[in-house]
């Protein structure tokens, strides 16, 4: 299965994926191998839930390793020194006024592979992220959301 999709990422995002990959290849693989050995020592595999669970975990981890390797191989890393402060782009940190909640929020615009809404890292492909891309300080955007339309004003763009 060859996936040649390009993954737009920040250098920080690449580093996190590399760290996760290293952890899975070293620590996690070793843990799973040990679980399989212990489960095999119980004998009969036909009713060995520990063995089945360890093999399922192994399959998940190996799948994630393949996914991470592919993402890193096809990463298109955004050079922070080339990020314009004139308009929002991947890598920008955007201070916006959220008119729905009357609050100021900082969004870090990242590629989809490193999006984490809990840390206000939003994908350039998300509704809010894609609406912000290319906009300038002072622009007001209206973004369709499940509850209607959300309104944001761009207050600041930084790296």
UniProtKB/Swiss-Prot annotation:
Coiled coil: 14-76
Pfam families, sorted: GreA_GreB (PF01272), GreA_GreB_N (PF03449)
Gene Ontology molecular function, alphabetical: DNA binding; RNA polymerase binding
Protein's GO biological process: DNA-templated transcription elongation; regulation of DNA-templated transcription elongation
Alphabetical list of PROSITE patterns matching this protein: GREAB_1, GREAB_2
Role this protein plays: Necessary for efficient RNA polymerase transcription elongation past template-encoded arresting sites. The arresting sites in DNA have the property of trapping a certain fraction of elongating RNA polymerases that pass through, resulting in locked ternary complexes. Cleavage of the nascent transcript by cleavage factors such as GreA or GreB allows the resumption of elongation from the new 3'terminus. GreA releases sequences of 2 to 3 nucleotides.
Family per record: Belongs to the GreA/GreB family.
InterPro entries: GreA/GreB_C_sf, TF_GreA/GreB_CS, Tscrpt_elong_fac_GreA, Tscrpt_elong_fac_GreA/B, Tscrpt_elong_fac_GreA/B_C, Tscrpt_elong_fac_GreA/B_fam, Tscrpt_elong_fac_GreA/B_N, Tscrpt_elong_fac_GreA/B_N_sf
The entry's keywords: Coiled coil, DNA-binding, Transcription, Transcription regulation
Source organism of this protein record: Clostridium novyi (strain NT)
Protein name: Transcription elongation factor GreA
Keyword Translocase: no
């Amino acid at each position: 299965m060859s996936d040649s999709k390009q993954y737009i990422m920040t250098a920080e995002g690449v580093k996190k994926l590399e760290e996760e990959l290293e952890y899975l290849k070293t620590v996690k693989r070793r843990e799973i191998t040990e679980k399989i050995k212990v489960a095999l020592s119980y004998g009969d595999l036909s009713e060995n839930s520990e063995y089945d669970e360890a093999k399922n975990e192994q399959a998940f981890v190996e799948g994630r390793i393949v996914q991470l390797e592919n993402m890193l191989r096809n990463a298109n890393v955004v050079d922070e020194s080339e990020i314009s402060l004139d308009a929002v782009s991947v890598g920008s940190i955007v201070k916006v006024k959220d008119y729905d909640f009357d609050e100021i929020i900082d969004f870090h615009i990242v590629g989809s592979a490193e999006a984490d809404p809990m840390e206000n890292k939003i994908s350039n492909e998300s509704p809010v992220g894609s609406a912000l891309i290319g906009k300038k300080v002072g622009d007001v955007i209206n973004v369709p959301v499940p509850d209607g339309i959300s309104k944001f004003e761009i207050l600041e763009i930084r790296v």
